[in-house]
Amino acid sequence: MTTLRLESLKANKGARRRKLRKGRGIAAGQGASCGFGMRGQKSRSGRPTRPGFEGGQMPLYRRVPKLKHFPLVNPKHFTVLNVSALNSLKDGSTVNLDSLVKDGVVTSPKHPLKILGNGDLTAKKLTVQAAAFTASARTKIEAAGGSCETLD
């Protein structure tokens, strides 16, 4: 058995095919029209039509309206809770995500807590600890005598 050397390498039988020479007579199999059909734009010499060209008709990529908005790459997700949901809690208690899960107000604490301002808060002095507050939620909690603490 001969050793494998660079000069002794040889391709397998049938692995290398001869280049197809088009337009060199009908006996070659690719003569006359060279496999491009009879007539038309695609049978002519030169570059074929560009991608997306539809023969002069307004192409699809120009018929479709432009997108006006692209979504955020890394959006912030929050577990949202309205001010009206805080009415069920005890007066003077500290409200955070853990206490809300324990009280059964929040069922799936996947994301940080954000307090929204929908609804009314009865006069309760609550210390609310959340990642974010809306402006209306902050004013309603502080008007009821409570305080807002923003967590990082």
Curated annotation (Swiss-Prot):
It comes from the Bacteria. Residues 31-58 are annotated as: Disordered. It holds the Pfam family Ribosomal_L27A. Transmembrane segments: none annotated. One of its GO terms (cellular component) is cytosolic large ribosomal subunit. GO terms for molecular function: rRNA binding; structural constituent of ribosome. Keywords: Ribonucleoprotein, Ribosomal protein, RNA-binding, rRNA-binding. GO terms for biological process: translation. Belongs to the universal ribosomal protein uL15 family. HAMAP family: Ribosomal_uL15. This is Large ribosomal subunit protein uL15. It comes from Parasynechococcus marenigrum (strain WH8102). The gene is rplO.
